[in-house]
């Protein structure tokens, strides 16, 4: 698997909506995945024999317009979450500089360890609200999917989850790639 048509950072400016106010949400089962309150990592692991994190890039970056409340530099981590070697999710995480030195989490040393394992194993990180976004077939996310040999015939969907640690807030965005949506439909009882 190689990603050649784009480069880090892959993210784009996104209009996020509160799930309660979002209109025209996709039908189940994708809707259920978008709104799932627990760890997406755990949910994904339950659908495969081999789960892996492919790092696309990480480093200090200025957030995209409207992406973070402050326009100060944050640590950005972009990965693909793969199930049995197939990319299902593109994830983009924004971590404020003040959280990088917290003793409870070694964000800089995560490597290929899933971020969800860290966040959901620490009581000091409190999951917050979920927001939803829709991506057109000509978005950067769609281009990324196409570079992974995934055909983008329909709009794509993603979610952004807030995590709170003391007075700080970090964001984890998870966008479902076409392979995930197709597999979810097959998994539906």
From Swiss-Prot:
Gene3D superfamilies: Chorismate lyase-like. Pfam families: Chor_lyase (PF04345). GO terms for cellular component: cytosol. Pathway: Cofactor biosynthesis; ubiquinone biosynthesis. It catalyses: chorismate = 4-hydroxybenzoate + pyruvate. GO terms for molecular function: chorismate lyase activity. Substrate binds at residues 77, 115, 174. GO terms for biological process: pyruvate biosynthetic process; ubiquinone biosynthetic process. It is an enzyme of class 4 (lyase). It is found in: Cytoplasm. It comes from the Bacteria. Removes the pyruvyl group from chorismate, with concomitant aromatization of the ring, to provide 4-hydroxybenzoate (4HB) for the ubiquinone pathway. HAMAP family: UbiC. Belongs to the UbiC family. PANTHER family: CHORISMATE PYRUVATE-LYASE. This is Probable chorismate pyruvate-lyase. It comes from Shewanella sp. (strain MR-7).
